[in-house]
Amino acid sequence: MATTKQSPLKTLNTLLAPGAPLASEDLAAMGISADLAVHYVRAGWLTRLARGVFCRPNDPPALHPCLLLLQRKLEGLHVGGRSALDWHGLRQYVAQQPMLQLYGWTAGHLPSWFTDRFPAEYHRKRLFDERPETLLHVGPFEQRSRAAQVSAPERGLLELLSEVGVRQSLQEAGELVESTYSLRADVLRELLERCTSVKTVRLCLLLGQKGSLPWISKLDPATLPKGSDRPWVSRSAEGLLVLKP
């Protein structure tokens, strides 16, 4: 019995999820060479987003599929900090055009085809004693298939606090901490124990105590890496920040 081989174009339209961009290697895996991809673009069957990145016509790239593609390019890429808290519903107000906060293990930059559609910032950050292939408390958003990697709210909080005095105001951080009454103390404890930033650990304890949050009473400061007995001091646009051990 004769069999009919499916054309590469039909394979692309059958397998590709809505809103998903494609890299050149994805096309090659479907039997679409670089020359054939050029032909498809000229024929209007593919849209070129940038060199080596394509999407289907009349199928605008969606955020999660785009992040999944970037995760293959930037080791340890995930939604973190203020954005992670926002995704988990922990926010003080809704920004008109929020800036997506992305963190990763290595230095790099976000391509313009992505940032033109989704305003975002990428920062290399190694805040915990961990490996990029097994990031602590980072996983698919809401455990959904084909969802981007995002920090758990406990990790998002510490990533946010690590930015205080750099790209994050202390006042806004304090306001956000006030909304974290539902954080899991055991998860926060594990992250704090493996946190490499003395400032972040001290600031978490200070703001937790100031807000009388439920999780603070379940943490033992004596077991956490708070550094030496000397105060941690930093000057920013907001003034002098002094964190006692």
Describe the role of every protein-language-model region.
Residues 30, 134-245:
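Hydrophobic alpha-helical interaction segments
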Residues 42-44, 55, 98-103, 221:
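Short linear loop/turn motifs
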Residues 25, 83, 97-100, 170-173, ...:
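Short coil/turn segments at secondary-structure boundaries
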Residues 55, 101-103, 121, 235, ...:
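Residues in well-ordered beta-strands of folded domains
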Residues 81-140, 145:
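Exposed, interaction-prone assembly regions rather than primary DNA-binding/catalytic cores
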Residues 1-82, 181-196:
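Short beta-edge/loop segments at beta->alpha junctions of small alpha/beta modules
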Residues 67-71, 116-119, 205-212:
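Long, compositionally biased
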